[in-house]
């Protein structure tokens, strides 16, 4: 038996969630080990859909382009009868994102891309390594590992992160109950070729409704490749049975062939009560599992890892205290709980609505679904929910704001006083805990510039606006705010002064930091910045803090409370 020195982070599980966390820790220069008991990436891809918000996160990691090159986009979801009559059409393209679609990519291919990216960052996956047990101490966790050949190892880690799936060894070792239910039916799916009886769009998914149950087909990379999914199919997953499912539930004359793999599994709806216990934390399926309706499980897990990674980075480097990690549970547990509720309702609804056997009941169902789904507000709500762009942390303990009432300011303290209209317009800007909008704006010679790429890199970003006033006094105040952050946080904070012109103001001639020109005011309007204000953006792209007027004192007070 060998014993290693104290390790900052031990990650158990090298699926998409564990790999995402490892990539994040690499970027934040946090030493870690990533262990996985399997000897190769998964073959059976239960997960396949990547939604808009997850793709934004992968863009930040530098992976989105490669993922998009290998994946197949789906820009709409259709519910149809067996004779191709469309009942519901949900478009996913009307979003404020560079990724207005669902991407279909097998979990195996995603794992391979993440593993390759991790290797480029110097990270290693230690395969055929199993976590046997662990014991928590005051300031570390003692972990017992087993390797091939009966070799054992003791690892002492400051933090143990369980990304080891639904049967998590870490969760079981913590004794946390996995609260919820198991559905009475099973899910059967396969990666197959489908020759449709009539030509179909290659960028749309379809669910066929029949008296025998639903049958879904999602486009995959490759010629005529699809993920074929059947709920409550009693037969074993064989090619003959998938053809039978198509004959019974899908359109006539369609041929299923060339399966790459086929699988059947039970689906659950479960979640732990807390994501952190001492120095052990849970991510992804180790913390929550639910029905695959909506394809949000993988996305929720990846976003768990993305939320936790930057916080571990700040704690490791001594910028923040250990208590910051408590916010991981406070922010991510409610998100998964909402997903569980919505997918549970949808799954149970499928069991009732989609298996109506009588013609009149099906006709009534189809008419009601067609009417409701045609409403623009329903379309937008469904699309936003699927994309996960509306995920927010409004009730998080680590977000906040300070906004002075217009009549409470004199304007003689170096700050510019907002008017009453300025006050209300600022209130309509992105609230603390909200995702930062990916604003398109014109700047210098660039006709279509995006905001989010300017906020990549894993740092906190401070957006400093002087509003419409654009006075020398206002700009001097903004530079003072930026200068006050530099001695405390160095390059972990990036300050951007945003000006409503095409030229650098004379008052900023000596400003060496980031200057964003916003001559048409797109950024100012998006952030409600009619007057002087600031926004602090977290490394994961959410608003941490905002103030009107821009105040370095209130910003530093906030950071002192959050980081400790």
Predicted segment positions?
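Helical substrate-recognition/capping region of FAD-dependent monooxygenase/halogenase enzymes
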Residues: 2-8, 12, 27-28, 81-84, ...
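Conserved FAD-binding catalytic core of PHBH/FMO-like flavoproteins
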Residues: 69, 116, 159, 163-267
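FAD/FMN-dependent oxidoreductases across multiple families
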Residues: 70, 236-300, 320, 325, ...
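Core beta-strand elements of the Rossmann-like FAD/NAD(P) dinucleotide-binding domain
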Residues: 7, 149-159
